[in-house]
Amino acid sequence: MLDNFDLLGVKISVTNLAKACQAIEDWIKTGRRAYVCIVPVATIVNCQDDRQYREIVNGAGMNTPDGMPLVWLGRMKGYKEIDRTYGPDLMRKFCALSQDRGYRHYFYGGTPETIKLLVSKLREQFPRLNIAGYFAPPFREIREKEETSVLGQINAGRPDILWVGLGSPKQDYWMHDHRNELDVPVMVGIGAAFDFIAGVKKQAPLWMRKSGLEWFFRLCSEPKRLWRRYQIGRAHV
């Protein structure tokens, strides 16, 4: 059972990579259905303006702290074991341990090119990884028949874990909305992890990730896409 603390009405789980992997594995073993939100500061900000989104995030089985400010706050509250639980690192670590457990993985999100690169990289890094399937949805609004077909494909693959890379908040809404239609123990909204692991986008240097400056690296890398996210966050602060 994970401890949680409240930050501006948003649940943050007291976790680290090892504890997060253990929680996911426990849910797979028990068959409990849960979704996991990877929570950076931007998600906290978005939750302040959107009550429905806040309820969706708070309904997750685990909200991992994906940002050093959240880790620092948790440690100030006395949770010494809390550490940044970064999406790409969580995905790599769970894929690594899955090789000996036989857990089945399904990947949903990204572009057709990115997801093929992702699967290729994962098979290269984790040769015994059991990949149940993958699908990149179209950028346009997906039609109801298409959605039904994709959900059927996912269920037919019998995955133990579904990695959802649609970006936040879209992936969090998607997991919540389809949680009762999918026979999958665990879904994880993994954000840009598909792009990073596939090698499509560069990750910030480790020192920037550890010092809480990854946002600056990403803003410089993708100013047109991310300026609004970080400007809104600064305005709230």
Question: What are these language model-derived features?
Answer:
Residues 1-89:
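N-terminal nucleotide/polyanion-binding subdomain common to many enzyme families
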Residues 40-44, 166-171, 193-194:
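Short glycine-rich anion-binding loops that position phosphate/pyrophosphate groups of nucleotides
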Residues 51, 55-59, 172-192:
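A short, gly/pro- and small-residue-rich
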Residues 61, 132, 160, 185:
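Conserved acidic residues
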Residues 71-153, 157:
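Conserved beta-alpha
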Residues 136-142, 185-221:
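Short, flexible loop segments at boundaries between secondary-structure elements
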Residues 154-168, 184:
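Proline-aspartate-enriched helix->loop->beta-strand connector
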Residues 235-237:
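Conserved small/polar residues in nucleotide/adenosyl-binding loops
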